[in-house]
């Protein structure tokens, strides 16, 4: 069978390695195909793969190539629509999963030479089912182990972990052990679920080489102050404990936003304001994000009320 010419398009840009495209590249190269980033309709391609992670609110789609026998579009971003209620909705019928033989390919890191870290996703799914998040709709409400660390890592000094809720996975002890044994600097990019962390988890985390830890306090109706305080007491760092994402512009009042921000700061965490549907967010929410996320301003002006005067 003659080899094919394959084009790849990372619709979101090249700011972070796209795991699906790296696997697709590895699969086609293993089959003797030529793989490159699509760059012009002057070039004919047998197949062009377009991958999009984010919704149109953050990443606009790009035109489909016209000089290709087949164009395959996939990724969460192609499954999200914005409803009349102003909220995103995930259409599972549009979800295009990678074939099993592609899913099992070791990622082709060579297509992103600007990055020197590994990217892993060793578990999928999340039991939370948060209305602003698409993980449960896409992957299910049970966190399950889907791979080993060695399926992604071959000695890189850093690993960016994409598991949506590794702390909810029944096999988390095994996965935590695998990550520790790499000796690599670890970054749980999707955050750790503070509600599920136990003493064994904290002990494992204390033995890891870490970038900044990430957590979330998205729903102000959840009283998580005790959980955050327990982790702070057990974690080896006593300052700069971790970054905590605080969702705003999604069923929360300004009073609730500020309570989370002030409480987290007082315990040694770094709150980070996330704005839902930012293009349509009110001015005050955008000011809150600017104040909180600029640490020079945040550390010099302790109260948001003073910042907006």
Model-predicted segments: where are they?
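Core AdoMet radical
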Residues: 8, 13, 49-53, 134-231, ...
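Flexible, charged surface loops at secondary-structure boundaries
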Residues: 1-3, 40-46, 65-67, 113, ...
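Canonical Radical SAM [4Fe-4S] cluster-binding loop centered on the CxxxCxxC motif
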Residues: 19-20, 112-151
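Short, charged, surface-exposed secondary-structure boundary motifs
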Residues: 18, 46-48, 60, 80-96, ...
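Ser/Thr/Gly-rich flexible loops in soluble cytosolic domains mediating phosphotransfer, phosphorylation
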Residues: 69-107
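A short, structured N-terminal alpha-helical element that caps or precedes a catalytic domain
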Residues: 1-73, 78-80
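A structural motif corresponding to the C-terminal lobe/cap of the Radical SAM core domain
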Residues: 207, 212-214, 221-309
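A short helix->loop->beta-strand "cap" motif at the edges of active sites that frequently abuts
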Residues: 66-74, 184, 238-240, 269
């Amino acid at each position: 069978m003659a080899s094919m010419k394959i084009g790849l398009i990372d619709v979101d840009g090249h700011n972070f390695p796209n795991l699906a495209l790296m696997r697709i590249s590895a699969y086609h190269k293993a089959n003797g195909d030529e793989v490159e980033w699509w760059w012009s309709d002057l070039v004919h391609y047998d197949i062009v793969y377009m991958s999009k992670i984010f919704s149109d609110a953050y990443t606009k789609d790009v035109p489909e190539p016209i000089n290709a026998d087949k164009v395959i579009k996939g990724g969460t971003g192609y499954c999200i629509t914005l409803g009349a209620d102003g909220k995103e909705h995930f259409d599972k019928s549009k979800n295009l999963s990678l074939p099993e033989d592609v899913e099992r390919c070791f990622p082709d890191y060579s297509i992103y030479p600007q990055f020197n870290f590994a990217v892993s996703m060793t578990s999928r799914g999340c039991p939370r089912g948060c209305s602003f998040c698409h993980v449960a709709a896409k992957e299910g409400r049970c966190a399950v182990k889907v791979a080993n660390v060695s399926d992604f890592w071959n000695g890189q000094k850093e690993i960016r972990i994409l598991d949506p809720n590794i702390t909810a996975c029944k096999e988390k002890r095994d996965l935590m052990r695998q990550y520790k044994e790499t000796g690599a600097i670890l970054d749980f990019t999707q955050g750790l679920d503070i509600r599920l962390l136990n003493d064994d988890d904290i002990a494992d985390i204390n033995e890891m080489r870490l970038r900044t830890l990430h957590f979330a306090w998205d729903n102000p109706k959840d009283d998580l102050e005790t959980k955050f305080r327990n982790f702070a007491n057990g974690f080896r760092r006593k300052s700069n404990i971790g970054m905590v994402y605080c969702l705003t512009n999604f069923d929360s009042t300004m009073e609730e936003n500020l309570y989370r921000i002030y409480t987290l700061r007082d315990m040694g965490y770094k709150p980070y304001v996330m704005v839902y549907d930012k293009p349509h967010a009110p001015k005050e929410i955008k000011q809150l994000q600017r104040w909180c996320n600029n640490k020079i301003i945040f550390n010099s002006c302790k109260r948001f009320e003073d910042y907006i005067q």
